[in-house]
């Protein structure tokens, strides 16, 4: 198990180094002070994921732990999408289709995806699916109303107020059965 975590953290840092080097190439014309500031911000974000993971069992104030969790997990997703976008532009360059603004386009696409995902996370919605099951019941009962919820992320990801909102949304459906997944 420790080997798995070492490999996972190594991949995470390799991805961040790849993003950092690509960003350094894209920002070559910027003043030194701007580069230093962006480097400090970048590595603070990159290390926040590791920090939030290591601080899980400590007695941090809830606000600090929640903030570290939000930044750390957000940075993990940022790293994933940014690396994928940068690889696409590097493949273009490999096949002699260089894109001068590949880093900036990757950054824009990644931040757009993160913003879209965060908005949807903060504004949960309900969807209705009617599923017909061709099975006779013992009693000729009314249709069963099932509510399925997933990706709630209890803990530092979802606080008590957000959980209360989810419970109200679920109860408003008046379900016969609640399924909780993920």
Feature annotation, model-predicted:
Residues 119-181:
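Membrane-interface segments at or immediately adjacent to transmembrane helices
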